[in-house]
């Protein structure tokens, strides 16, 4: 449904210095936009007649539905017609369109889902939050670096702390993946503070 995205877009252009392109069925988006007062030069619409549902296989749907909103938006991003892309649709389709259309940053082995969670010390990031089922140590190191860059550039934290989720704070705790990742994170160009337990996330022990 377009209600929440349209309302969010209207609020964003009023409160922030941004221009937004809403991608979807034009007549539906226009009808929803008509209920709001907003600067017309700040919001435009790109028509996309197809939708990828949560019941479809993401990669197959992205390849076959060329006019799906997430595919149209990803192509616009690749062409330089936008600086960022937001989606409230099928997460798998968003990941697939990012990989198949936009592509990965050079040197990055895998994409990751980053979730900002509330904590006792403000928003904290959990990365990866579900994009990968099996990872290697080098993947986790890259996730830590990407998360650190985001927290510095978007939330303005000068030297974000990075923790490694484990079943104990001591360096030797955790499964084999955790143990192999720990020394690599120590050498990485980030502010690594060691292992943190699950309770450390809501307590804000790491950024």
Regions found by a protein language model. Give the residues of each.
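Short glycine/serine/threonine-rich phosphate/pyrophosphate-binding segments
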Residues: 1-7, 67-80, 84-98, 109-113, ...
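Short beta-strand segments
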Residues: 22-24, 46, 87-89, 116-117, ...
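N-terminal short beta-loop-beta anion/metal-coordinating cradle
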Residues: 27-54, 108-111, 115-119
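Glycine-rich phosphate/diphosphate-binding loop of Rossmann-like nucleotide-binding domains
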Residues: 19-21, 26-30, 133-198, 204
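Short, acidic/small-residue loops that bind anionic groups at enzyme active sites
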Residues: 96-130, 187-196
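Phosphate/nucleotide-donor binding subsite
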Residues: 38-82
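N-terminal phosphate-binding or glycine-rich loops at protein starts, especially the Walker A/P-loop
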Residues: 1-31
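Solvent-exposed alpha-helices and their adjacent loops that cap or buttress functional pockets
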Residues: 14-15, 37-38, 62, 66, ...
